[in-house]
């Protein structure tokens, strides 16, 4: 992913550096996501187990949806139910399944834990304040995770506005402007009702957003909090997202204190 580009300059450099870890496996097992074609050519010294969405591999997976929009997975011909509409969560389940089954655990055991899993704080955790639905995805952010979080927000059914509150995506180096502009284009395409941005880099995001009824940039956290506290309405669905250094969880907690 594009996380930590500042230290590595390119996704290819990140791949090269992280891929080097496989050289130290010796007799270990490498679990490789074959949905990412860039990973298929990595040299691995130990055993290789492959998994991936829509990929020819040891644990091939497909995604379907239940009547309520929840994700259903077919992994190596096994049906796995989830209670989530979060595509990122589903992709993690595919990886976890490959590891769990090859280590000798049973599918039924895995299914039970998937259905009872609750995301930790800051990791697409769902909170409720009166009739408002909150997605707390404040732990960290890059372009890919922001896009996934917005898609997750848009998967929620029912009345109410779809709102995002975005803080800077940090550690992107020279790619920061481009990455933040791409996020703005995603916001434009997503049929959002409101976008609130904060942070120096988010100026690039805010500047390219088109067609969103409310598109507001803030350089003052207090002003943003005050506006949200006064303007949120019943049945709103609101996503908070930003890099660790932006401490977006503080904005969330202040809005709903």
Predicted regions and their residues:
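ATP-dependent carboxylate/acyl-activation modules
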Residues: 121-123, 245, 249-251
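Short amphipathic alpha-helix with an adjacent loop that forms part of the alpha/beta core around
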Residues: 225-231
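Short SAM/SAH-binding signature in class I
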Residues: 95, 233-241
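Active-site beta-alpha connecting loops in nucleotide-dependent enzymes
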Residues: 119-120, 138, 142-211, 217
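Short beta-strand segments
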Residues: 33, 165-167, 241
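Short acidic-hydrophobic, aromatic-tinged amphipathic segments that line or gate anion-handling sites
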Residues: 215-224
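A short acidic, helix-capping loop that chelates divalent metal ions and anchors anionic groups
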Residues: 2-8, 135, 169-174, 240
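Acidic, Mg2+-coordinating active-site environments of NTP-dependent enzymes
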Residues: 1-134, 159-160, 185-188, 192-194, ...
